């Protein structure tokens, strides 16, 4: 499905752009640009979809399955409605199709990612900072200045908090930039005791 989508985007670019760019850059530079663009484009589209899941009532009906967890564990990530899984899968296919087709169209060659153990190098570094603990009761916050750029495990735990004051904040997955630009960023205090799930009215 991803290959078909990539081919469709590539053919569309051929149809709407009358000339084929001839950008001569070294393979290393193209790989670096592609890795960076995929990391950023993938993350901003995740923010947009996550924002919609919280603010569009019919989508919240699916996403609240994830937020109904009263205890966070690494398995909470799998507590997801099948429709939400489908939405994020389609998002991923679209992101990769657009970027891969655009880079092949612009540079006339295949593209590769810079990876560590098969993972985008940006995500690998983020995982080293403890991102896999976001769905846990291990409260890890970063320095305040860093939490303006990266979402810490504590910030995501605030996102899951049952406290109405925390609802609708920290919608970012990796980068906190989108939350900062859209007014949904919440810096995590150094120490805070949290309850999760719903208290009375369902949170958004």
Where are these regions (language model features)?
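Membrane-embedded catalytic scaffold of the fatty acid hydroxylase/desaturase
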Residues: 1-7, 24-195
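Membrane-interface helix termini and inter-helical loops of multi-pass transporters
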Residues: 13-24, 108
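Long, intrinsically disordered, low-complexity Ser/Thr/Pro-rich regulatory/activation regions
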Residues: 192-204
């Amino acid at each position: 499905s991803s290959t078909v989508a990539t081919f469709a985007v590539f053919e569309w670019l051929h149809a709407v752009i009358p000339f084929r760019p001839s950008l001569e850059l070294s393979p290393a530079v193209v790989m670096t640009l592609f890795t960076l663009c995929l990391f950023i484009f993938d993350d901003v589209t995740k923010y947009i979809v996550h924002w919609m899941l919280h603010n569009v009532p019919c989508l919240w009906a699916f996403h609240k399955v994830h937020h109904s967890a009263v205890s966070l564990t690494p398995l909470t990530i799998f507590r997801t409605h099948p429709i939400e899984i489908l939405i994020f899968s389609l998002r991923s296919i679209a992101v990769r199709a657009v970027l891969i087709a655009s880079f092949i169209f612009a540079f006339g060659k295949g593209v590769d990612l810079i990876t560590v153990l098969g993972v985008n190098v940006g995500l690998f570094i983020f995982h080293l900072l403890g991102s896999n603990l976001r769905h846990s009761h291990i409260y890890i916050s970063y320095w305040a200045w860093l939490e303006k750029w990266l979402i810490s495990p504590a910030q995501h735990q605030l996102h899951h908090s049952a406290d109405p004051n925390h609802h609708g904040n920290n919608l970012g997955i990796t980068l906190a930039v989108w939350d900062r630009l859209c007014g949904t960023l919440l810096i995590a205090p150094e120490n805070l005791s949290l309850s999760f799930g719903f208290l009375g009215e369902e949170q958004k």
